[in-house]
């Protein structure tokens, strides 16, 4: 079991930072990679796992601290898993609104029965940059893609992701509830279990 007093979170994404800090709680002091560098590593992996490890190693190298990275995205069944690892850059880096518009356009003629999707999160924790045994935890949240945006909470694809067990979009959930149900919450629960938190 790894004992952590502090770690660096390998993300400049304010939404992810807020979610993951809330999930980790006060037992571990979380610092942002932004305290050490504004440069993000090139995500050259072909999977969420590869990119999470790459980001964690980079953050550990820059900070000298244990590092936690999240690589996550939306995998839409009808689109063969796209946008997948390219979720944040789906509309050529033009932001959440453009990503959502592109997804709605790609799905406009898709019947309801074929709109299944999953939010996927892979957390990678490394003790140091050359850690030969990263801890990997995966969370998957099943849902479907709506025909229009709904809700004002969250970020990314949350307004388009229907949560069947709550009969609403992810963006209609209170942040506390999303932090209990989401793909990141599922991955974080596994990580906390592995760390004995």
UniProtKB/Swiss-Prot annotation:
Organism, as annotated: Pseudomonas aeruginosa (strain ATCC 15692 / DSM 22644 / CIP 104116 / JCM 14847 / LMG 12228 / 1C / PRS 101 / PAO1)
Enzyme class, broadest EC rank: hydrolase
UniProt record similarity statement: Belongs to the HAM1 NTPase family.
Subunit relationships: Homodimer.
Keywords of this entry: Hydrolase, Magnesium, Metal-binding, Nucleotide metabolism, Nucleotide-binding
Location of the active site: 71 (proton acceptor)
Lineage: Bacteria, Pseudomonadati, Pseudomonadota, Gammaproteobacteria, Pseudomonadales
Cofactor remark: Binds 1 Mg(2+) ion per subunit.
Cofactor: Mg(2+)
EC number: 3.6.1.66
Binding site for Mg(2+): 42, 71
Sites where the protein binds substrate: 11-16, 72, 155-158, 178, 183-184
Reported function: Pyrophosphatase that catalyzes the hydrolysis of nucleoside triphosphates to their monophosphate derivatives, with a high preference for the non-canonical purine nucleotides XTP (xanthosine triphosphate), dITP (deoxyinosine triphosphate) and ITP. Seems to function as a house-cleaning enzyme that removes non-canonical purine nucleotides from the nucleotide pool, thus preventing their incorporation into DNA/RNA and avoiding chromosomal lesions.
Pfam families from the UniProt entry: Ham1p_like
HAMAP family named among the record's database cross-references: Non_canon_purine_NTPase
PANTHER family: INOSINE TRIPHOSPHATE PYROPHOSPHATASE, INOSINE TRIPHOSPHATE PYROPHOSPHATASE/HAM1 PROTEIN
Protein name per Swiss-Prot or TrEMBL: dITP/XTP pyrophosphatase
């Amino acid at each position: 079991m790894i004992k952590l007093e502090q770690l660096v979170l390998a993300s400049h994404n304010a939404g992810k930072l807020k979610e993951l800090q809330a999930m980790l709680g006060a037992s571990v002091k979380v610092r942002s990679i932004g305290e050490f560098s504004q440069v993000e590593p090139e995500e050259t992996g072909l999977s969420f796992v590869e990119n999470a490890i790459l980001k964690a190693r980079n953050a550990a190298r820059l900070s000298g601290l244990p590092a936690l990275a999240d690589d996550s995205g939306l995998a839409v069944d009808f689109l063969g898993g796209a946008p997948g690892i390219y979720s944040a850059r789906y509309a050529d880096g033009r932001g959440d609104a453009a990503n959502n518009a592109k997804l709605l356009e790609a799905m406009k003629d898709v019947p309801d029965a074929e709109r299944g999707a999953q939010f996927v999160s892979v957390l990678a924790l490394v003790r140091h940059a050359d850690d030969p045994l990263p801890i990997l935890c995966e969370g998957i949240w099943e849902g479907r893609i709506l025909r229009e945006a709904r809700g004002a909470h969250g970020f990314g694809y949350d307004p388009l992701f229907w949560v069947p067990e709550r009969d609403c979009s992810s963006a209609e959930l209170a942040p506390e509830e999303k932090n209990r149900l989401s793909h990141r919450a599922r991955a974080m629960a596994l990580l906390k279990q592995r760390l004995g938190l």
